[in-house]
Regions:
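Structural preference for solvent-exposed beta-strand-turn elements
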Residues: 1-179
Length: 181
């Protein structure tokens, strides 16, 4: 197993053009990461599937503005601590397991409890593979009996540094570990 990549320094400014074909998983990750960036992120050729639109609605609920045109999508990120939302909000991941799981990494240090829901299909999927590692960082969750959606994340203002090894090779779990804030 290769040594882990450790990034000790924050990226001060990132201004590059990256060209990728429309892809659901990449598009969802772009929306979520753009919500964390400070300033405007632009994407052309973003796949505007129902899952990606659900991701855009999710960051809108968290206080991040967006603009969708025929040619591009803009996300107006406010930085890592830039989410501004009301108490008692619910984020609907619809049928997107990627959104339902990765959004938890963004909400790990949330101030107020946030409920995550999904459609019938997503509500049958086990979420422990992401709630367990995030719990080690200090987040708290209220899961239903089947350990699926709906769930509530309580987050933590006192996150812990942990050594976590992803044994199942899950791209979602790896992404989750990278984007938790």
């Amino acid at each position: 197993m290769p040594d882990p990549l450790i990034i000790n320094d924050k990226i001060g400014r990132f201004k590059k053009v990256i060209s990728v074909s429309g892809d659901k998983s990449i598009s969802i990750r772009w929306v979520l990461l753009s919500s964390l960036a400070k300033g405007v992120s632009n994407a052309k050729n973003l796949l505007l599937s129902e899952d990606v639109l659900a991701a855009i609605r999710a960051v809108n609920i968290l206080g991040i503005k967006s603009k969708i045109t025929k040619k591009e999508v803009k996300i107006y990120g406010k930085g890592i601590k830039g989410y501004n939302y009301k108490k008692n909000i619910t984020i609907d991941a619809r049928n997107s397991g990627t959104l339902g799981r990765l959004i938890l990494g963004l909400l790990i240090n949330t101030t107020y409890p946030i409920k995550i829901i999904g459609d019938n299909s997503l509500s049958k999927r086990d979420f422990r593979r992401v709630t367990q590692p995030l719990s080690k960082f200090g987040a708290q969750f209220k899961l239903n009996k089947s350990k699926s959606l709906p769930l509530t994340i309580f987050g933590s203002q006192k996150l812990k540094s942990v050594k976590y090894i992803e044994k199942k090779g899950s791209a979602q779990c790896k992404s989750l570990s990278l984007i938790h804030i």
